[in-house]
């Protein structure tokens, strides 16, 4: 027997090629192919329980025409039907009156409770719930007919008009033959993951009932109940709340209370496992014990609480009801364990010593070999196209910028061509062989400082720079291979967030400083001209037959102006423009002759436009404008669109803006040298041994730079599935140091900001999410193809000069500023710096401030600021040769902080070092589990201790 409307639904689903038997699997598209665990990250309930869609159908129209109308729905948050406006409200946290919960408990205690009901359709279910002694056969028949009526759903697609409203007629508003195909194509259904189930709550006033009628049913197997719910899902729960007319919104609030109860994951967990009425009431009592009561007069009950940015962890809630249901219990957890709930305290397998020579390298190779085929197949996704375009432009800009700086620092021994070629060769080789192919190799500020010092040393002592540099690179490769052989990479366990944030902040400030500095240099090259200033003038000189530039050499003057010109010999540019001066045989002289005063202003305009536009588009993903698909595209291609906008404005203005300069010929920058560097040149042989001393300092710098970046990229919160490769990465860097030294190319190491930008452009997020729930972070699209494509395009860029020459340099400087600001603003260190400037009453409610006194937080931040300032000063002075030692000194400073801060304070301010982690259980630092209001961990996600604090949002 088919229920009313079931045939229409089957026909509609057949049009979509959706088998009715697959309705219990959610959307026909099935699970997201990007990650089979798409729904696993949702906070809808314990992992073994499917998410539940709940709908409240209210009986309206008594005593005239009775009809069921959908008035509310729940997935994670509540959506109310705005009847007058004809639309759904924004998702919000549901609020209930305490009497409604108490009345609901009384009704359930006296009503009908059916657990594991064997009903297979709506008709059988209705027959079960109406078998009560208080109903006569006539009333039972009327009630069954009423319960079998098709409810009026409010289905509204994006961009369509409301299904009903105050200006529409009742007949049009309540079309009982709504097409079921619209139900199959419901946008809400697309937001529900596979395996989702439904629950229906029916409530209302019924005049022929003398006393309330309550029934709660849990079906043994999820069953499709026809058009009872707007989303065609198999139903698991059914709740009926009917009774005689009463004042107020009694039954409406009772229905909301039942739906809110079922939407609670803990109550739902208990009800799914309840065996009798006592278990059901016990779960309800446990819910009541957790309810927070707001005093009347201090809060507007009609106000809607927006969904929080992040939901509290389920294990933070008291396990009372789990202990009472079937004797189950939840293990006791301390705050120290919760502090590390997203990552184990024990070191990862990549950071455990094997005790064998090159043992860590061998393990990295074995671990990565099994993932190698998927490193290419996982790149077959449109998101990778956006990542390639963005990182390519950022890499090319970085290579050209550092190539120019390197050319200035080495007097042309290396230049832009070597920078582009070296970036392409080293980057592509690293992507093919490395353990973490998401890393972007590039010239970095610290390495550039070392190159400048090394060249100055060779110049002062009349040494051949490139041969001496070759031996430095050889020794660096030897030292790095020794570090790989002895498994020195396990020492990165001592690189805590204190060290990571100091290094990341330094690199970010270098990006910001270089971007602003380039704009100031551009303003100096194209100065702002003010009328009346000396630099504003331009004079035209005319040479005479004897070299006297004051003589007029053209035919005899015929006008008063000509006579004045003959007497002066100099014509002001306002009377004779430079191009006319040349046509007349003169020479324009003066600083203002070839200066366009608008370039500086419009360069600043393009600089700020690209910077602000990239930020605005990146934040578009979380805005309220446009559909989610459009927002995601705009956010993914934010930097590309910002660059295109800058190019469009430049073409529209038509000014001679400085453009991106790419070498047109494939030959070394230094004339007369080949691609292979001679081993000695004019240097004595013993310099090959003496080069070991500067190589030792450079090895420390390379190790710190490479491994700090690797630690940041491989943090637990990024959910990388394929593991890290600390030993293999350092091995590849050592080989590339040898290769680039032999070819006379720049040295390359992991670029922190570019690597994090690469990872952020490959973020994977869940597709199915409840209304009001933000997309959950699923991880990073780990593959090798995007990096390989980026560096291949970088090498081809040498031949793409006709295309790249249209990109204005101020636009690229704006993108550089964007990358630096985004990197700097995303680390917790900057959040704590902001706290130093806020009065205590205006500070956000952070987890950090709940466990650590504010004065201690400020002291920790001040120490970090002092270390950062010292690093910057050393980098900018001739003492920069000891810069690698200062980076290593950050670890020593962090170790010394154990004498200033307690382990519990360091647990929240930073991370514990390996020795401290072993001592945490012994010291008993953390108190027992507390469930007071002050410990409700509801702060923003960015302040969660193990959240991705260093998360560059630059794509």
From Swiss-Prot:
Subcellular location: Lateral cell membrane; Apical cell membrane; Basolateral cell membrane
GO molecular function, one term: chloride:bicarbonate antiporter activity
GO BP, one annotated term: sodium ion transmembrane transport
Domain of life (superkingdom): Eukaryota
Pfam families cross-referenced by the UniProt entry: Band_3_cyto, HCO3_cotransp
TM annotation in the entry: 387-407, 415-435, 472-492, 503-523, 596-616, 637-657, 684-704, 730-750, 785-804, 811-830, 871-891
Catalytic reaction equation(s): 2 hydrogencarbonate(out) + chloride(in) + Na(+)(out) = 2 hydrogencarbonate(in) + chloride(out) + Na(+)(in); K(+)(in) + 2 hydrogencarbonate(in) + chloride(out) = K(+)(out) + 2 hydrogencarbonate(out) + chloride(in); Li(+)(in) + 2 hydrogencarbonate(in) + chloride(out) = Li(+)(out) + 2 hydrogencarbonate(out) + chloride(in); Rb(+)(in) + 2 hydrogencarbonate(in) + chloride(out) = Rb(+)(out) + 2 hydrogencarbonate(out) + chloride(in)
An annotated GO cellular component: apical plasma membrane
Tissue: Highly expressed in kidney. Expressed in the outer medulla and the inner medulla in the kidney cortex. Only expressed in beta-intercalated cells.
Annotated glycosylation sites: 548, 572, 951
Chain segments carrying region Disordered: 20-50, 154-190, 331-352, 918-955
Protein's membrane topology: Multi-pass membrane protein
Xref: InterPro entries: Band3_cytoplasmic_dom (IPR013769), HCO3_transpt-like_TM_dom (IPR011531), HCO3_transpt_euk (IPR003020), Na/HCO3_transpt (IPR003024), PTrfase/Anion_transptr (IPR016152)
This protein's UniProt keywords: Anion exchange, Antiport, Cell membrane, Glycoprotein, Ion transport, Membrane, Transmembrane, Transmembrane helix, Transport
Region called Membrane (anion exchange), residue ranges: 387-955
Function: Electroneutral Cl(-)/HCO3(-) antiporter that favors chloride ion entry and efflux of hydrogencarbonate and sodium ion across the basolateral membrane and may participat in salivary secretion. Also mediates Cl(-)/HCO3(-) exchange activity in the presence of K(+) as well as Cs(+), Li(+), and Rb(+). Does not contribute to Cl(-)/HCO3(-) exchanger in the apical membrane of the upper villous epithelium.
Family that this chain belongs to: Belongs to the anion exchanger (TC 2.A.31) family.
Listed NCBIfam families: ae
PANTHER family: ANION EXCHANGE PROTEIN (PTHR11453), ANION EXCHANGE PROTEIN 4 (PTHR11453:SF52)
Protein name: Anion exchange protein 4
Organism listed in the record: Oryctolagus cuniculus
Gene: SLC4A9
């Amino acid at each position: 027997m088919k229920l009313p409307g079931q045939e229409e639904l089957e026909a509609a689903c057949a049009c979509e090629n959706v088998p009715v038997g697959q309705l219990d699997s959610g959307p026909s598209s099935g699970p997201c192919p990007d990650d089979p665990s798409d729904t696993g990250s949702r906070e809808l309930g314990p992992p073994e329980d499917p998410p539940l869609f709940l709908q409240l159908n209210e009986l309206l129209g008594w005593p005239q025409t009775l009809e069921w109308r959908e008035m509310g729905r729940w997935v994670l948050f509540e959506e109310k039907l705005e009847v007058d406006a004809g639309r759904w409200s924004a998702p919000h946290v549901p609020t209930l009156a305490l009497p409604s919960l108490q009345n609901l408990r009384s009704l359930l205690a006296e009503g009908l409770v059916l657990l594991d009901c064997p009903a297979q359709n709506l008709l059988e279910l209705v027959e079960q719930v109406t078998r009560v002694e208080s109903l006569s056969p006539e009333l039972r028949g009327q009630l069954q007919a009423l319960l079998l009526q098709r409810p009026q759903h409010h289905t509204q697609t994006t961009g369509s008009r409301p299904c009903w409203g105050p200006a529409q007629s009742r007949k049009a508003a309540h079309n009982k033959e709504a097409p079921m195909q619209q139900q199959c194509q419901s946008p809400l259904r697309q937001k529900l993951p596979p395996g989702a189930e439904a629950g229906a709550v029916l409530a209302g006033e019924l005049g022929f009932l003398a006393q309330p009628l309550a029934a709660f049913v849990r079906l043994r197997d999820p069953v499709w109940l026809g058009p009872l719910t707007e989303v065609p899902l198999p139903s698991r729960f059914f709740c009926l709340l009917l009774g005689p007319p009463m004042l107020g919104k009694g039954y409406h609030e009772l229905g909301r209370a039942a739906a809110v109860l079922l939407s609670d994951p803990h109550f739902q967990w208990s009800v799914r496992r309840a065996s009798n009425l006592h278990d059901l009431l016990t779960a309800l009592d446990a819910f009541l014990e957790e309810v927070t009561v707001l005093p009347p007069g201090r809060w507007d009950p009609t106000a809607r609480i927006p969904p929080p940015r992040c939901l509290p962890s389920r294990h933070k809630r008291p396990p009372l009801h789990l202990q009472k249901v079937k004797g189950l219990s939840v293990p006791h957890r301390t705050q120290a364990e919760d502090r590390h709930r997203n990552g184990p305290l024990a070191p990862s397998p990549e950071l455990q010593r094997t005790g064998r020579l090159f043992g860590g390298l061998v393990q990295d190779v074995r671990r990565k070999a099994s993932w190698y085929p998927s490193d290419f197949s996982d790149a077959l996704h449109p998101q990778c196209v956006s990542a390639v375009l963005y990182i390519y432009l950022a890499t090319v800009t970085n290579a050209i910028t550092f190539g120019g700086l390197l050319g200035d620092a080495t007097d042309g021994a290396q230049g832009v061509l070597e920078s582009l070629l070296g970036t392409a060769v080293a980057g592509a080789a690293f992507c093919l062989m490395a353990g973490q192919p998401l890393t972007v190799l590039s010239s970095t500020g610290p390495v550039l400082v070392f190159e400048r010092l090394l060249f100055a040393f060779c110049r002062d002592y009349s040494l051949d720079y490139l041969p001496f540099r070759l031996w430095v690179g050889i020794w660096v490769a030897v030292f790095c291979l020794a570090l790989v052989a002895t498994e020195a990479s396990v020492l990165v366990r001592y690189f805590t967030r204190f060290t990571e944030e100091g290094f990341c902040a330094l690199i970010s400030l270098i990006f910001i400083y270089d971007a602003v500095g380039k704009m100031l240099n551009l303003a100096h090259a194209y100065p702002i001209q003010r009328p009346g200033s000396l630099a504003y003038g331009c004079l035209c000189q005319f040479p005479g037959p004897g070299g006297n530039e004051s003589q007029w050499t053209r035919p005899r003057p015929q006008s008063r102006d000509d006579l004045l010109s003959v007497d002066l010999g100099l014509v002001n540019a306002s009377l004779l423009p430079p191009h006319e001066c040349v046509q007349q045989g003169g020479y324009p002289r003066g600083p203002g002759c070839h200066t366009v005063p608008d370039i500086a202003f419009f360069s600043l305009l393009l600089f700020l436009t690209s910077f602000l536009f990239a930020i605005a588009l990146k934040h578009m993903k979380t805005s309220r404008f446009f559909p989610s698909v459009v927002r995601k595209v705009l956010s993914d291609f934010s930097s590309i669109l910002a660059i295109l906008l800058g190019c469009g404005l430049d073409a529209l203005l038509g000014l001679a803006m400085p453009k991106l300069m790419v070498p047109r010929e494939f030959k070394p920058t230094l004339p007369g040298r080949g691609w292979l560097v001679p081993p000695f040149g004019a240097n004595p042989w013993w310099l090959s041994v003496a080069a070991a001393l500067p190589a030792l300092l450079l090895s420390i710098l390379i190790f710190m730079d490479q491994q700090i970046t690797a630690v940041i990229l491989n943090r637990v919160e990024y959910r990388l599935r394929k593991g890290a490769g600390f030993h293999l990465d350092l091995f590849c860097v050592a080989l590339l140091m040898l290769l680039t030294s032999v070819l006379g190319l720049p040295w390359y190491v992991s670029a922190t900001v570019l690597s994090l930008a690469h990872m952020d452009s490959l973020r994977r997020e869940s597709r199915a999410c409840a209304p009001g729930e933000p997309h959950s972070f699923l991880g990073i699209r780990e593959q090798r193809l995007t990096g390989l494509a980026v560096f291949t395009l970088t090498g081809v860029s040498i031949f793409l000069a006709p295309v790249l020459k249209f990109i204005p340099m101020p636009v690229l400087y704006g993108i550089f500023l964007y990358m630096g600001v985004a990197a700097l603003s995303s680390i917790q260190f900057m959040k704590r710096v902001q706290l130093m400037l806020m009065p205590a009453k205006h500070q956000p409610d952070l987890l950090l401030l709940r466990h650590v006194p504010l004065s201690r937080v400020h002291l920790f931040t001040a120490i970090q600021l002092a270390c950062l300032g010292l690093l910057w000063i050393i980098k900018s002075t001739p003492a920069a040769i000891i810069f690698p030692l200062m980076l290593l000194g950050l670890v020593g400073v962090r170790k010394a902080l154990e004498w200033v801060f307690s382990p519990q304070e360091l647990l929240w301010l930073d991370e514990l070092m390996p020795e401290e982690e072993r001592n945490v259980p012994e010291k008993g630092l953390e108190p027992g589990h507390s469930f007071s209001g002050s410990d409700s961990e509801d702060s923003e996600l960015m302040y969660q201790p193990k959240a991705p604090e260093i998360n560059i949002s630059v794509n």
